[in-house]
From Swiss-Prot:
Residues 586-761 form the PCI domain. It comes from Meyerozyma guilliermondii (strain ATCC 6260 / CBS 566 / DSM 6381 / JCM 1539 / NBRC 10279 / NRRL Y-324) (Yeast). Component of the eukaryotic translation initiation factor 3 (eIF-3) complex, which is involved in protein synthesis of a specialized repertoire of mRNAs and, together with other initiation factors, stimulates binding of mRNA and methionyl-tRNAi to the 40S ribosome. The eIF-3 complex specifically targets and initiates translation of a subset of mRNAs involved in cell proliferation. This is Eukaryotic translation initiation factor 3 subunit C. It comes from the Eukaryota. One of its GO terms (molecular function) is RNA binding. It is found in: Cytoplasm. The keyword Transferase does not apply. Residues 1-97, 783-817 are annotated as: Disordered. HAMAP family: eIF3c. It holds the Pfam family PCI. The keyword Protein biosynthesis applies.
Length: 836
């Protein structure tokens, strides 16, 4: 029966029931069973003759029969029996219940000890330990009888061990293992409660009481006595607190936020009158503990990040104020005694061990992780991105301080790496931005800073800032800093329309040769720089170089992974922590639709004339350029029965290519210019004007390739009118085509017409081309039949010659193609493979 019906329901009693354990619950249930059995007996003894008298006897009927008598109508006469039931109930608190359980466990341990049943003793002692943990969690303290049990058990185990050594009779293996485990656990508990154990041995009468021994006075005496250092010296209260926090750092079941609060209170108390050494030590410990508190989260909470940023600024303020006395540097020597100040150097400055660079790097990493875990299309991301200004200001300020604390003779070496790391961090914040944003960031960063930098002067132009930082990094030890400086510079110049400088830096450095053995972050930066170089070449009008730079990476199936912008081959939930941290925040991404649009436009301008030339030439004179990528898109479009108006970027470019094949450059330009993504590029009008000129030129070339087998003469004036370009430019284009051997023609004496002449390779009709293809296939079929007839040993001369020719062609083009080959980042195991 439910307890709700037994004792009634009350909101207050129900809430108290959560904290109380009723020791007479079994009695209550037994009383219910007795009453229920009485009802059952009465029910069993009833017969049909008594049923008519049930109402007159006052016995319940129907559902009311199963209610307790206290709930029946007219049950007030049973008040005496109810009061007797209430008198038998004993309600104990959770503390009393837990104490009884612990006493039972102690008795079980003592009983097993007397019987030398060490397996049972170990089991009961472990149960007693779990109960003790519960008592500590609920704030009940350590019972006195537990300390008694612990001391007695320790003494008995020592005595048993001594007797066991003297005795010839040994324990069996199971008892011996249990006995050894029990000794270890008892020893650990004695060490943990050493102060209570010592107190019990000295004053056992204090433990005769039921309540735990009041150790407040003892604790106060212990706290009043300063802690000792490793050399036996007494620690001050400040360093005693710091040492206690440091000793518990990293351990389980430690409330890190409580440690943060302790350090914050300590800093507030010590700041007005404490020594600089104490205050600096508190600042460094507080920053580290705050970072530890959020180490198990995906990112640091915003309020904690803001507090750490303010604390780091306060630390730099304090260090700058006492720069003639104390410095924090990675060059400082650590000591086991946290309260000992290091000796002063020749300048009278004490170098404290620490790292301003590491604190700034960690703060910046937490900022990036917050952005990575925020929806980039939300207002929260935009609001959070505003904090980048504060982060960059802190990076510049930290660089100035590290410059002052890093001697000149260690710069460029491994010992001075702290300066190189923070300069690298500064470059990482500005290399992808246009000059206007860099200038705004620099002016804001230097507004509240005094002094100047030896690496980059104050109020320098954006170009000088990038060049100065890159020059400093290029002189550092290790491969990551020179390569990073070079790729940062290439990316910056490419973004800011300085294509020629970016291209010369990229090619002259030969950075592509060892990129597959570089760090993953450098590989991602390399791919980003190469893509930005291709986009810059397109804006500059170098279509072929842009196509060459973007060709491999745009056709890759792992485009997002190569650029550090996501995953193509796996779900984000399947990625490791290292792979996720390698990703860039959204505001640093390269627009992949823009990349695809630029690459396909370059393919259109290059491959459409090649397709026209190949369709009207002999096989021997066709160009070796691979034109399958764009040709497959056109063939797929031609196989469609119904094609609607263009919608996507790809549709616009395919329709534009079809128009260009027909010589309709104007319609091709109209289709390309309606693509809205061009507005993302700077100088949009100049870009469209450049595309217009390229379409006119390539349209003219396509027209000549298409109709050279039909016409014997073409008018220069007519061509100039069709393609809306002047006659001099038409003559220049045709002259280049003639001199390069693309067409067999000549210009008339008056330069007014183009005369096509028959070449040594006769122009063939479509039927002739199909006949030649059929002849080649028949030859291959004949070779296959001969090979089958001779048990697989047919003629191989032709095949070997073809393979040799293909090998020579690959060797010739390998050196040229590898210049713009992307770094293949292997995200599965963070190893890097070279593309074959």
């Amino acid at each position: 029966m439910s307890r709700f019906f037994v004792s009634g329901y009350d909101s207050e009693s129900s809430s108290e029931e959560e904290d109380l354990l009723t020791s007479s619950e079994e009695e209550l249930m037994s009383s219910e069973q007795e009453s229920d059995s009485e009802f059952d007996d009465e029910f069993a003894n009833d017969d049909d003759s008594d049923s008519s008298d049930s109402d007159s006897d006052g016995r319940p009927s129907g559902p009311a029969y199963f209610l307790k008598s206290s709930f029946r109508k007219g049950a007030g006469g049973d008040s005496d029996s109810d009061s007797e039931d209430e008198g038998r109930r004993v309600v104990k608190s959770a503390k009393e219940k837990l104490t009884d359980d612990m006493k039972d466990a102690v008795e079980a341990v003592n009983s097993a000890k007397r019987q030398e049943n060490w397996i049972s003793a170990l089991t009961e002692f472990e149960r007693l330990g779990r109960l003790l943990v519960r008592a500590g969690q609920q704030g009940f303290g350590t019972p006195n009888f537990y300390i008694k049990c612990l001391v007695d058990l320790e003494a008995y185990l020592i005595e048993t061990t001594a007797n066991e050594k003297e005795s010839t009779r040994k324990m069996n293996a199971n008892l011996a293992r249990a006995f050894t485990s029990l000794k270890q656990r008892v020893k650990k508990q004695v060490k943990e409660f050493s102060h209570l154990v010592e107190l019990y041995k000295s004053e056992p009468e204090l433990f005769d009481k039921e309540e735990p021994v009041e150790t407040i006075e003892k604790d106060a005496e212990i706290q009043a006595t300063p802690l000792a250092s490793s050399t036996g010296r007494a620690l001050s209260p400040v360093f005693a607190t710091l040492k206690s926090v440091a000793e518990t750092r990293g351990k389980k079941n430690i409330d890190k936020f409580e440690q943060v609060q302790i350090l914050e209170d300590l800093l507030e108390e010590v700041s007005p009158k404490g020594s600089p050494f104490e205050i600096i030590s508190i600042y460094q410990m507080l920053l580290s503990i705050r970072f530890d508190a959020s180490s198990h989260h995906a990112f640091m909470p915003l309020d904690q990040w803001q507090k750490n940023k303010d604390t780091l600024n306060d630390l730099l303020d304090f260090l700058e104020k006492h720069s003639n006395e104390y410095q924090v540097s990675e060059l400082g020597t650590a000591s086991d005694d946290i309260d000992l100040e290091p000796p002063a150097n020749a300048d009278g400055i004490r170098i404290l061990p620490g790292s301003v660079t590491s604190h700034i790097e960690r703060l910046d990493d937490e900022f990036i992780r917050y952005l990575q875990n925020t929806d980039p299309h939300s207002l929260e991301y935009i609001d959070r991105l505003k904090d980048e200004k504060d982060t960059y200001n802190l990076v510049v300020r930290g660089q100035l301080y590290v410059e002052k604390t890093t001697p000149d003779h260690v710069r460029g070496t491994y010992q001075g790496e702290q300066l190189a790391r923070i300069v690298m961090r500064r470059m990482n914040h500005i290399y992808y931005k246009p000059d206007q944003l860099i200038k705004a960031n620099e002016s804001e960063a230097w507004r509240h800073l005094s002094g100047d930098s030896q690496i980059v002067a104050k109020n320098s132009e954006p170009k000088d800032v990038i060049n100065g930082l890159a020059e400093f990094l290029s002189k550092q030890d290790g491969a990551i800093y020179p390569k990073g400086a070079l790729l940062f510079s290439v990316y910056y110049h490419a973004v800011n329309n300085d294509y020629s400088v970016a291209r010369d830096m990229f090619l002259s450095s030969q950075v592509h040769q060892g990129i597959n053995n570089a760090d993953s972050s450098i590989q991602v930066l390399y791919n980003r720089a190469m893509v930005q170089l291709g986009l810059s070449a397109f804006r500059y009008g170098n279509i072929e170089e842009s196509h060459q730079a973007l060709n491999e990476i745009a056709n890759s199936q792992r485009l997002k992974e190569l650029l550090g912008q996501g995953f193509n081959s796996k779900y984000p939930s399947q990625a490791t922590v290292a792979e996720k941290q390698r990703l860039l925040p959204f505001h640093m991404h390269i627009n992949l639709e823009l990349l695809e649009c630029v690459f396909m436009t370059c393919s259109l301008l290059i491959e459409i004339p090649q397709l026209a030339a190949a369709s009207n030439s002999t096989k021997e004179s066709r160009r070796k350029t691979n034109i399958k990528s764009f040709k497959s898109k056109l063939e797929f479009h031609d196989r469609q029965y119904f094609t609607g108006p263009p919608e996507s970027i790809k549709d616009h470019i395919v329709h534009a290519s079809i128009s260009l094949q027909k010589g309709d450059w104007h319609n091709a330009y109209k289709l390309l210019s309606t693509i809205k993504i061009w507005k993302l590029l700077p100088n949009n009008d100049q870009l469209l004007e450049m595309m217009r000129g390229k379409l006119q030129v390539e349209g003219l070339r396509t027209y000549i390739f298409t109709y050279k087998s039909i016409y014997t003469k073409l008018s220069v004036v007519k061509l100039a009118k069709i393609f809306d370009i002047n006659e001099e430019e038409v003559l220049s284009i045709v002259d280049k085509m003639i001199s390069s051997g693309e067409v067999s023609a000549s210009l008339s004496d008056d330069k007014k017409s183009i005369n096509f002449v028959s070449s040594e390779h006769l122009q063939r009709t479509r039927l002739q081309e199909l006949a030649i293809v059929m002849n080649e296939k028949i030859g291959l079929l004949t070779d296959k039949n001969e090979k089958t007839a001779s048990n697989g040993h047919g003629r191989k001369t032709t095949q070997q010659q073809q393979q040799q020719q293909q090998k020579e062609q690959r060797e010739q083009t390998h050196d040229e193609n590898i210049k713009f080959r992307y770094a293949n980042v292997n995200t599965n195991n963070d190893e890097f493979q070279t593309i074959a």
